[in-house]
Every structure is written in C-alpha cells, then in structure tokens.
A protein has these predicted regions:
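Short, charged amphipathic alpha-helical surface segments
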Residues: 65-127
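Basic helix-turn-helix/winged-helix DNA-binding cores
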Residues: 1-61
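Conserved class I S-adenosyl-L-methionine
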Residues: 132-179
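C-terminal alpha-helical "lid/dimerization" subdomain adjacent to the S-adenosyl-L-methionine
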Residues: 280-335
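A short acidic, Gly/Pro-enriched loop at the edge of an enzyme's catalytic core
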Residues: 235-247
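Class I SAM-dependent methyltransferase SAM/SAH-binding core
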Residues: 185-189, 193-236
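Core SAM-dependent methyltransferase catalytic element
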Residues: 327-349
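A short glycine-rich, Lys/Arg-flanked "PGG" loop and its adjoining helix->strand segment in the class I
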Residues: 262-274
Length: 349
C-alpha cells in the first residue's frame, strides 16, 4: 500500500510516517521504477506499535532499541502486540506509584495542617529513586542469545564453581515448598525456558509466566503449550492485581540490584491474592558478613576468577530480602539448598 493509504489506516498524517521513517523505525520498500514507498502489513503493525509506545510516553530512542531486539528475534504480529502490552503494563504500574505518592502527600498535608516542603521533597525523591531503579535495568547477559543453550548450561555437571549446582533438585524443592494444588492459578516470574513452569503445571495448577526475553519465551511456550506466557519485566508484571494463589521464581532475581529486588517483591505482592504464597530459589548469601567471609576465603585460595563471576551478578543478601518481605506483609522463612542457592518461602499474613 502507498503512504496515503497507510496514513488513513493508522489515522495519522503522511508527515508523521515520514518522520518515523527518517528515525529508522520503519523501512518501507521502494517500488521499482517509480520510487514510491510500498508498505506491507508488517509495516502497519510495526508503526502501530511505535504509535502506541509514543502515546504512553516512550522515547524514540527507547522504541528504536526495543524494535531492534525484536528484529534480532522472532518478528510478526504477536511480538508487536506483546511489546505494546508489556510497555502499557509498565506505564500503568509507574502511574500507580505516582498516584500512591501523590495520595501520600495529600494525606500528609491534611494531617499536618500545612505544607512541609522537606517532607514532600522526601516523598518525591523516594518516588524518583524507584522510577530510576526500574528504568536503569539493562540486559547485559543477552538472554536472547543464551536461550538456545540455556538448558544445557544449567544442567551440565562441572568441576569447581557451579552456581547451578543440583539445578533439577532445586526446582523440585521449590515446587514442594509452594505446593501447587489443582484449581489454583500460579505465576512463574522470569520463567526463562519454562523449566519451573512445567513442574508447577504438572501438579495440576493453571500456570502463567512472563519473561523479558522473546527467545526464552519461545522455548517456554514450546515446552508448555498450556501456559499463558507473556512478555514482561520484574518491574511491571503483565498481569492484573490479586490474580494468583502463588508466585514462584527461580534463578532470576540475581540479575537485579538490591533496590530492584524490592520493586520485584512489591510486584509479587500486587498480583497475589490474600493469603497468597511466594517461593524464591536464587543465588544468595545469608548476610553481608557471610558474603565477605566467603569472598575472602576465595581470595585466600587464589580463586579470583570465581570472585569476578560472583561480583558480575547481584547475589541477594538474604537478611535484607526477608526484611523487605516482612515490610510488604509477608511471613517469610528461608533455608540454604546448595553453596549459593537459598530457598525463600513467604505467605501473606
């Protein structure tokens, strides 16, 4: 189709289409001889995605990066729609936090009878820090490229440092702890290739899942055709409030900073039903002293390469994780399963 027909279908001007073309967000083919732009159905959905993301406040550069990630993986209508939905959920969660902050400011002014600039500034700064923590995450592990070999990587036996030691047994222990029941609905947060989702589903529960990597999701869906798997992040679960009886996550939170982990736990809280359950199996140290002692022992034995690998990730401080869960209204407990993996289980009070 020509540019005028494209503009009519999308309810935008030809000038807007040319602008997005100049920015490299859409690249229509040129007709032989005439040089006129020829748009395809793929171009329609690509531009529709751009328009939607612009309407909810995403920058041109961020859209360009997201589209590039899609281009590197599997394209098509489904992925454009998933991208739109993921970002809309992200924006919704962010706006919900803005509403919460504003309501807290109003309540404080009503309570104190006058405006305290320092107090309001503190609330605004806290909101800003949370927003920055959500937006600063970068996939420096390149999970789309890891997807093809991920299952082999986590299950193969190896000598020396092995953060995925007893991987299968860890997942089994998590499933036993969260104890899915037929008729329940659960969420596998950061599902990866869907190994945990498969185990949860085998217990008879209805399972949903999300991951930020399209390639990981592709493999999850191949293993779990009955699972509702969505594109999403730990900062904005692509599901509505109070939907799940339990949330489970494995080997995912160590890709988030401590501040980002708290945001992820708050999202777990948001999507859980009253008395909901949360189970986390991930790389952790008991507390700061445990971490320091372990790294010093590695240093004394000359294993500087292991120290570098640990410090490249964000192994959790279990004591801080438990404190954050308590603050969110959970009753948490924890146990250590392997050298680096701990299992945290929590129930809403």
């Amino acid at each position: 189709m020509h540019i005028k027909e494209m503009a009519r279908r999308l309810q935008i001007t030809p000038r807007a289409i040319r602008f997005y073309e100049e920015k490299g967000l859409v690249t229509p083919k040129k007709a032989d001889g005439s040089g006129y732009r020829q748009f395809t159905e793929e171009d329609v959905w690509r531009l529709q995605t751009v328009i939607t993301l612009r309407e909810v406040g995403m920058s041109i550069e961020d859209i360009r990066q997201l589209l590039r990630q899609l281009d590197e993986g599997e394209g098509g209508l489904l992925h454009y729609l998933e991208l739109q939905l993921s970002f809309v959920y992200d924006r919704w969660v962010e706006l919900s936090k803005v509403i919460h902050t504003t309501e807290a400011m109003i309540a404080r002014v009503k309570r104190d009878g006058e405006s305290d600039p320092a107090s309001l500034f503190e609330l605004a700064e806290a909101s800003k820090r949370l927003r920055l923590a959500r937006s600063n995450w970068v996939d420096r592990w390149n999970f789309n490229q890891l997807a093809a070999d991920y299952d082999k990587m986590v299950t193969e036996s190896r000598e020396g440092f092995n953060p995925h030691e007893r991987y299968e047994q860890v997942l089994d222990a998590l499933v036993e702890k969260v104890a899915p029941q037929p008729g329940e609905t659960g969420l596998d947060a950061g599902t990866g290739t869907g190994n945990l989702a498969r185990r949860l589903r085998e217990r008879g529960a209805t399972i949903c899942a999300f991951d930020q990597s399209p390639e990981m999701l592709k493999r999850c869906r191949q293993k779990n055709p009955g699972v509702e798997a969505k594109l999403g992040t730990f900062f904005a679960f692509p599901f509505l409030d109070s939907r799940f009886d339990f949330v489970a996550t494995s080997y995912a939170l160590h890709h988030l900073t401590d501040e980002q982990k708290v945001l992820a736990l708050a999202e777990c809280r948001r999507v859980l039903k009253p008395a909901g359950r949360l189970a986390i199996a991930d790389l952790m140290f008991t507390d700061a002293d445990h971490r320091a002692q372990h790294l010093e022992a590695l240093r004394q034995s000359g294993q500087t390469d292991v120290i570098e690998r640990i410090e490249y990730e964000y192994y959790a401080d279990r004591s801080r994780l438990l404190a954050a869960l308590e603050e969110l209204g959970f009753q948490p407990e924890a146990e250590q399963l392997t050298t680096y993996v701990h299992l945290v289980f929590a129930r809403l009070a």
